[in-house]
């Protein structure tokens, strides 16, 4: 996820490194450049996988560096699994202190969630701040010489949306809309939220802004924008449960499909995230495997693990 910050063309994020080498390149560059400090993004999965060694190297080199660990409990690269070998937040703060990190600050969307955790489980003098104060937290860490860490604790929004869809976690009822007749298209809501669901729309009165409801994560940070055009809507309690069609057909009565004469069959499927392309590929692959056929499959999901609007294409050879 932190690599995708480079897609934003504002020059604030730059440079790439191999997985697990985050921060190591700055330790080598630092003595030869005028810049005194650097922020280094890293995900929790990468940190627990191999990035912790790069942090240890930065501490050994006494680099003036702040790691920003995105603690979102999801490996977005491979399907939002839990990071292997991960530590919970209190254990992580103690680990960082033991490695020689000078200061650790946690930012989160819900600081009250930590009230039930015993203080003895945290590292000493632990600082917890609301995510709205993340800029102040970064300034505070930058002022400390040596290696510091900002841990941003917030669940992966894309995975949270999937869990809500499956009914595994609570879904907020309130929805946010923008009255296009009032909106002036200033874009402040997009700046405040940095959200992909805040999208421009062309109207007869010029460029306005809308909230894309299917992709909305119900984070509500867009309403922090200085704008009177927001509308908060709570839908009725009546649930729209779409029943599956009642298809009363026995499998034995389904005619066999026309078989190809070729010994090798190639299938190519194209879609977008959420349309079931990967699922269909897996079903066909499993069916062929059960018939003792050799199967070669390739899922190219791109960024559709994060954004349902991104392309997914699957190749299958049986």
Can you describe what each PLM-predicted range is?
Residues 5-8, 49-51, 58, 76-79, ...:
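Short helix/loop capping segments that flank catalytic or ligand/cofactor-binding pockets
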Residues 6-147:
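Thiamine diphosphate
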Residues 248-264:
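A short, basic/flexible loop-to-alpha-helix module at the beginning of a structural domain
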Residues 277-297:
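Glycine-rich phosphate/diphosphate-binding loop of Rossmann-like nucleotide-binding domains
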